[in-house]
Amino acid sequence: MHSVTSNAVANAFNNTPSVLIEVAGHLGNMYLCKFGKVVYMSFNSDWTSLVAGDNPNLATVPQGYRPITRCSVKETSTTNATLYINENGSVNCYNYGSAITQATNGNYFACWITGD
C-alpha cells in the first residue's frame, strides 16, 4: 500500500485542475493528482450509480499524469472497481462486483500504476 494519507490526497485535489466527465449518466468533475507512480482520482458524484458490469470510459488523462507508457491498476481503495489507463490516456473503470460505495474525503479512489 502507498503511504500517502487520505488527507494529503484530499488537500492536493484542492489545487488540481478538474475535467468534466460523465459516469453512468451523472455529470461531475474528476480531479487527478500524482504521487510518484500512484495516480489518485476523485469524482464528485455518486459512485453507486455504477452497477456491476459497467465499464464507462471516464476521461482522457492529461499528459502530465502519464509518466509510463504501459500501465495497469494493481489496487484501488474500493474492492469492486478496477481501473485501466490506456496508452492514449483514456481511463476505463470496470465494476465486477456490487455497486461501488462512495469513499469519504472527496469520494476519491486510488490507482496503483505499474509499468515502464
Model-derived regions: residue spans:
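Structured loops at beta-to-helix junctions and adjacent beta-edge loops in soluble globular domains
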Residues: 42-44, 96
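Surface-exposed ligand/attachment interfaces on beta-rich extracellular proteins
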Residues: 13-35, 44-63
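Fibrous stalk/shaft segments of extracellular and virion attachment machinery
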Residues: 1-17
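Extracellular jelly-roll beta-sandwich "head" domains, especially the C-terminal globular C1q domain
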Residues: 27-28, 50-60, 68-116
